[in-house]
Amino acid sequence: MADRKAQVSRDTLETQISVELNLDGTGTGKFNTGVPFLEHMMDQIARHGFIDLDVTCKGDTYIDDHHSVEDIGITIGQAMAKAVGDKRGIRRYGHAYVPLDEALSRVVIDFSGRPGLIMNIPFTQKRIGKFDTELFWEFFQGFVNHAGVTLHVDCLRGENAHHQIETVFKAFGRSLRMALERDERLGDAMPSTKGTL
């Protein structure tokens, strides 16, 4: 079986980003992005997805975090698409419900080749510490567009905004883990009646 690893760099006038990931890792995360709360969330992807994820970013955070957050999502999406390859033998679909105290979120993903984000998180605060909660949409939209996935994200309940988004990222990691798992019954087959994704 081929290694499912990828390294992608993205350089613009706003950000310089490097992402390395291993889809068959142990859940190790290394982050140096200048956006600490996003690093905390990406660590949930690594740990709950059993994905080794190394992300570095130098961005124009003296303006705000928008460019860094969006471009990190884009670059992780590009690395994901590269590591997944032609999708032969994977389960394709993944889903997870994750609670954290009063908060509960559901994430459903399809490695369909068709980018789509449907996201409903009724945040109880506009900021978590210094982090603008609107930027989570930018992160996931960047990821979806470049990974070529359909992603449904719903926070079903929650009072604490930190708990709300942490359950989302944990569920995202777990849904990735399920969707990317190799199914021995599929062998080298494409998980689609069309024969292609």
Swiss-Prot record:
This is Imidazoleglycerol-phosphate dehydratase. Pathway: Amino-acid biosynthesis; L-histidine biosynthesis; L-histidine from 5-phospho-alpha-D-ribose 1-diphosphate: step 6/9. It is found in: Cytoplasm. It is an enzyme of class 4 (lyase). InterPro entries: IGPD_sf (IPR038494), ImidazoleglycerolP_deHydtase (IPR000807), ImidazoleglycerP_deHydtase_CS (IPR020565), Ribosomal_Su5_D2-typ_SF (IPR020568). Its EC number is 4.2.1.19. GO terms for cellular component: cytoplasm. One of its GO terms (biological process) is L-histidine biosynthetic process.
